[in-house]
């Protein structure tokens, strides 16, 4: 923005012009010393090509797309055809997926912690994790623990169940229902016949190791009264179609059972063998038998049975990927730990496939992201780069190396890491926004230091995303004294402009691709999933936009000025904008000076020429252009102020 002050030959008539390009917010100095091109304040406005205009709003992404409870995750899974499925989670321990018309359960009964999930798609699965519940994978159909192979989930799609049983929609751990079996004193046997025989040996994918008898079979079972369960004749069985060759385990070997839910975990080697050669690779029938003691009645509901490696990647705070390998960071064994799965086999993890990054340096891993041929690992007070050589090596002996990037900047939040223009990585520290270009970490937020520096709480909640259509990176954060992300700071990397925004509570930001379009999705504290850069309101609430020009004075700030009028150009539109002004005779008065309305301009009126009468006398003047009705508008510079310098100094 060019600030030109023209003084007439008489030495009294004064014309001040604000010309493009405008450069966005500069909150580092007082309004009287804002550098050329910057603004002391701008809210809910964009500056494409340096021309100010009201920002585009947000709309509900899909009818009914509101997640219940306090949400802790918004993630996207992509099918092989690139079709997205959206996942969400909340603090009541529920994980959902969006069917296109409703949120539907994937898992229930997980931790009720406020810990946020981290997510990353690796190959054909979306991997999600938090440090309480562990690591899970979604394949487009179901959500299973990492390392698990599906056996049966008791959902309605499994239609080949035989025997007396019913769908239990009350006692459920996975999906929409469990499989309930009732015994009234005699054994009740219920069988499931998979469409294709189950191979409970072959590992998942082309490179994962095979399952052995040292691995485990797990399932959930809800028992209403364990004292009435005959554990000797209640069993699970996996075998051939004729029930002549099978592996069987009675409830006496399921571990300690209690009333309510029990998560049974048993070694394959613990199953008794019937017949000469039952084979784990061709399981054609899965049977559940429930028996009550004497003439008693007992109810048992089974849910979510799977085979899983005995050793799986531990629960961690952050997941990313590298060379098609799942990377998990900051785990339950150490906050500096990095774990890595076998290439192209995210389920397959070895206890030796782990190493620390800058261990015992006093800070923990906050986040990380793949970057070309490296993974950038951000700790509280430092950043590091790790590389790997996998060719010519055998897992878990991949060769990893690490090198420090900087100890001047750390990180505040994994979810603040955003890939921007030129494949640069941007993220928040506790008091800065920095950029990594593959060589060094540089601070980029100098112009808005006072805006960022007061942050003291909820640093972990800072979230970032990219609005490609506007050449912008977005970060939502919690200002001092608030408990939700009520502020947004946007960076227009084409104009190198910082653009604040208020009016939304964006607890998460997420980039997605749908039908070839890049989307920036967000979720509010009320669980509403919004598409940013869409519509003219913030989710039906009018957008209040404002633009504050720098303070101006005559050539001699000690001389009094009579401010006659301002001329504000604008594009034809609907609605109105209001031009306000405030005055001061000394810089110390600026902080408490209040705005007065000069005039409201009708944007569609052909007679409206944008001339605004001021008629005030002071040494300093500041103009503000504001719109509170949400009507879209564009300012067409220059903005001009006409004044006359008074002969008297007071």
Predicted regions and their residues:
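Short carbohydrate-recognition loop motifs
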Residues: 168-194
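Short beta-strand-plus-loop segments that form exposed binding edges in beta-rich domains
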Residues: 287-295, 624-630
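Extracellular ligand-binding interfaces
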Residues: 192-276, 295-300, 573-592
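Beta-sheet repeat architectures centered on beta-propellers
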Residues: 1-125, 408-416, 420-424, 430-650
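Extracellular carbohydrate-recognition regions
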Residues: 147-164
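Hydrophobic or amphipathic alpha-helical targeting/insertion segments
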Residues: 116-147
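Beta-propeller and closely related beta-pinwheel folds
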Residues: 59, 63-70, 109-110, 311-462, ...
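Extracellular beta-strand elements of beta-rich domains used
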Residues: 266, 286, 303-307, 638-639
């Amino acid at each position: 923005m060019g600030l030109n002050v023209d003084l007439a030959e008489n030495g009294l008539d004064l014309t001040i012009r604000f010309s493009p390009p405008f450069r966005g917010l500069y909150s580092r100095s007082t309004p009287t010393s804002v550098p050329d091109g910057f603004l002391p304040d701008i809210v809910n406005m964009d500056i494409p090509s340096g021309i100010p205009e009201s920002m585009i709003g947000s709309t509900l992404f899909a009818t009914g797309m509101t997640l219940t409870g306090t949400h802790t995750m918004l993630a996207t899974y992509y099918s092989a055809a690139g079709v997205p499925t959206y996942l969400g989670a909340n603090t009541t321990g529920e994980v959902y997926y969006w069917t296109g018309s409703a949120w539907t359960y994937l898992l229930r009964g997980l931790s009720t912690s406020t810990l946020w999930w981290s997510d990353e798609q690796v190959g054909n699965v979306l991997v999600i994790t938090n440090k309480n519940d562990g690591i899970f994978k979604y394949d487009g159909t179901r959500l299973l623990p990492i390392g698990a192979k599906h056996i049966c989930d008791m959902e309605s799609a499994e239609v080949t169940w035989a025997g007396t049983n019913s769908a239990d929609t009350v006692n459920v751990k996975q999906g929409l229902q469990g499989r309930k079996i009732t015994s009234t004193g005699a054994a009740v046997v219920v069988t499931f016949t998979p469409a294709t025989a189950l191979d409970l040996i072959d590992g998942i994918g082309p490179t994962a190791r095979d399952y052995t008898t040292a691995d485990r079979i797990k399932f959930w079972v809800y028992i209403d009264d364990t004292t009435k369960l005959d554990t000797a004749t209640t069993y699970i069985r996996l075998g051939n179609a004729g029930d002549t060759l099978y592996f069987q385990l009675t409830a006496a070997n399921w571990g300690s059972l209690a009333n309510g839910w029990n998560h049974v975990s048993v070694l394959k080697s613990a199953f008794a063998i019937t017949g000469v050669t039952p084979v784990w690779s061709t399981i054609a029938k899965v049977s559940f038998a429930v028996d009550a003691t004497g003439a008693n009645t007992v109810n048992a509901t089974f849910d979510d049975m799977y085979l899983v490696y005995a050793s799986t990647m531990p629960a961690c705070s952050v997941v990313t990927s590298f060379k098609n390998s799942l990377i998990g960071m900051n785990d339950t064994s150490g906050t500096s730990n990095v774990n890595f799965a076998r290439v192209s086999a995210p389920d397959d993890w070895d206890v030796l496939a782990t190493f620390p990054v800058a261990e015992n340096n006093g800070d923990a891993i906050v986040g990380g992201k793949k970057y070309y041929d490296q993974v950038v690992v951000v700790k509280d007070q430092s950043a590091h780069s790790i590389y790997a050589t996998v060719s010519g090596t055998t897992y878990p002996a991949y060769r990893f190396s690490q090198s420090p990037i900087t100890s001047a900047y750390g990180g505040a939040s994994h979810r603040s890491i955003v890939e921007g223009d030129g494949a640069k990585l941007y993220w928040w520290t506790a008091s800065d926004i920095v950029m990594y270009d593959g060589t060094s970490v540089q601070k980029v937020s100098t112009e808005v230091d006072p805006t960022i520096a007061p942050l003291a709480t909820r640093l972990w909640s800072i979230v970032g995303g990219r609005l490609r259509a506007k050449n912008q990176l977005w970060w939502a954060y919690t200002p001092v004294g608030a408990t939700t992300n009520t502020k947004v700071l946007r960076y227009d990397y084409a104009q190198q402009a910082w653009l604040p925004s208020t009016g939304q509570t964006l607890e998460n930001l997420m980039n997605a691709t749908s039908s070839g379009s890049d989307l920036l999705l967000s979720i509010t504290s009320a669980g509403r999933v919004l598409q940013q850069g869409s519509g003219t309101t913030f989710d039906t609430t009018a957008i209040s936009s404002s633009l504050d020009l720098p303070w101006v004075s005559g050539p001699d700030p000690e001389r009094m000025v009579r401010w006659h009028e301002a001329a504000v150009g604008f594009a034809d539109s609907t609605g109105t904008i209001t031009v306000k002004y405030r005055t001061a005779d000394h810089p110390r008065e600026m902080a408490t000076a209040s705005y007065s309305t000069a005039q409201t301009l009708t944007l569609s009126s052909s007679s409206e020429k944008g001339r605004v009468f001021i008629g005030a006398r002071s040494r300093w003047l500041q103009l503000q252009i504001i719109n509170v009705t949400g009507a879209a508008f564009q300012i067409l510079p220059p903005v001009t102020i006409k004044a006359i310098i008074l002969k008297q100094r007071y």
